[in-house]
Each structure stands twice: as C-alpha cells, then as structure tokens.
Amino acid sequence: MTTRLDDTFARCRAEGRAALVTYVMAGDPDPETSFAVLRALPAAGADIVEFGLPFTDPMADGPAIQAAGLRALKAGQSVARTLDLVRRFRAEDPRTPVILMGYYNPIYTYGVPRFLADAVAAGVDGLIVVDLPPEEDDELCLPARQAGLAFIRLATPTTDERRLPAVLANTSGFVYYVSITGITGAATPDFGAVASAVARIRAQTALPVVVGFGVKTGEHAAAIARNADGVVVGSALVDTLARSLDLEGRATSGSVAAVLALVRDLAAGVRSAAGGAA
C-alpha cells in the first residue's frame, strides 16, 4: 500500500520537479494563527508540511526556530494540542503529508505508545526526531514504523561512508540531507557540494533525498531542486512570521499573508527548476 508521502513524491516526479517541504512551528505565535498558516500552505505551493513540536532545549535549531518554540510554549502549545491541530488539518486536507519534527523528550514525556497511536489517529505521516541516533532505534524508530509512520533520518556533510549505512538502515519516507554543518537558519548552502552529497546518498538508497538548512529564497530553492527530490524551508518561514508580529509578539493582520507570500516564491523557484530533479 502506498502512503501519502509515496504518492506526493510520485506526483512531483511525474511533473519533473522536486517537492517543496515547508516547516512551521506548531502554535507559533498562537494556535489559531498557526492553524491558519498550516491549512493554507498546500494552496500556496507546499507539497509536504513539517510541523515543529516546540521544546525548551532545541539543540539543533538556530535563533529563529528557538524563538518560535518559546513563543508557542508561552501560548500553551503542547504535544496534545499539536496533534489536535493536525487532526483539524487532516479533516480538511486528506492528501498533503504531515511530518512532525522535534526532539524526543516531549514524545517520551507524553508516552511513546500513546503518542504513536494518537499521531496515527490524527493523520500524521512521519516523524523527524533529531536527537535519536540509529543506535537507539528501539526507542521510537522501530515502534513508529510498526505503527505505520515514516521515520525520517538526517544525513549531514559529516556523515561519511562508514556512518551512512547505519543512518539509512531503518529510515523510511525520505532521507533529509542537512546541507550545512551547524544549526538551522545558518549560512547559504554550497550548491555544488549538495549535488555531490545527494548523488552519494542516492547510490545507497532508493528513498527520495530532500535537502534543507540554509534555503531562504526562491533562487536557493531552485538551485537545490535541480539536484534533489525535495527542498525543505523552515527558518526563512519562521523568520518571516516573526517579523510580522507586533511588539508584544502577537500576530497581526498581515502575519499569515507574509508567510504564504514567501511560500509562493519558494514554490515558483522549485517549479522553475522542473526537469532538473532526477
């Protein structure tokens, strides 16, 4: 049986292009604004949605996503409320894949079996848990896959030929290649190095390879899309939302529109590279 992720990548391949994967933080700056952004992402051009689980100690994230998580937590966002937002989204949109991205602690605290059951029931398609290495697959990766969720791993510029097989072993859905060494939202990727890295990963897996970290504009997205199966954009969207907030950190009348305008630009960039994704 194919999954929403399988269908999405197949559809993008049929169109000769990469998928646009957009990341937003659940509950930022408040649940209703977050949901308004979430529900509008597909129409703006997002093929896959990553929804961040806010956490107090997001070690892999830069200042933009750290601040977004703190805003969400201040507004009362929790794992349960995040799953509620996914449930509401899924009631309106049966097609667009939703990936939850975050850290293990909130999931562990919620309870792994309960979390997996509730995530599946809400309509989640997969998980990215950045602080669980392959050596700890029994904790969440294998139970998640048994529950029917994709478990997406990160590969980085420092993932060498000895380490890559372990990273890929239980990965499903797609492989997420981190284009730079460091935290989210950092420098612009070296597009030539990204192309080489994607080719190296593709030599060892049939899974789609998507690339993220440092992608900020439609031009960046187009450059990545020529060599990858998908392009992830997160910090740029979170930054755009943050800049639209008032001095108290609350949403304004232009907040949702500002995020969607950038998504449309990114989607145009990805689609302008059609024919380049192989």
UniProtKB/Swiss-Prot annotation:
Q: Which domain of life is it from?
A: Bacteria
**Gene3D superfamilies per the UniProt record, alphabetical:** Aldolase class I (3.20.20.70)
Q: In which pathway does it act?
A: Amino-acid biosynthesis; L-tryptophan biosynthesis; L-tryptophan from chorismate: step 5/5
Q: Where are the transmembrane segments?
A: none
Keyword Iron among record annotations: no
Amino-acid biosynthesis: is it a keyword of this entry? yes
Q: Which GO terms describe its cellular component?
A: cytosol
Pfam families named among the record's database cross-references: Trp_syntA (PF00290)
Question: Which reactions are catalysed by this chain?
Answer: (1S,2R)-1-C-(indol-3-yl)glycerol 3-phosphate + L-serine = D-glyceraldehyde 3-phosphate + L-tryptophan + H2O
UniProt keywords, alphabetically: Amino-acid biosynthesis, Aromatic amino acid biosynthesis, Lyase, Tryptophan biosynthesis
Active site residues according to the UniProt entry: E50, D61
Output the Gene Ontology terms for molecular function. tryptophan synthase activity
Q: What EC number is given for this enzyme?
A: 4.2.1.20
Broad EC category = lyase
Subunit architecture: Tetramer of two alpha and two beta chains.
Protein function:
The alpha subunit is responsible for the aldol cleavage of indoleglycerol phosphate to indole and glyceraldehyde 3-phosphate.
Family, per entry = Belongs to the TrpA family.
Fetch the PANTHER family from UniProt.
Answer: TRYPTOPHAN SYNTHASE ALPHA CHAIN, CHLOROPLASTIC, TRYPTOPHAN SYNTHASE, ALPHA CHAIN
User: What's this protein's name?
Assistant: Tryptophan synthase alpha chain
Species name: Methylobacterium nodulans (strain LMG 21967 / CNCM I-2342 / ORS 2060)
- The gene for this chain is trpA
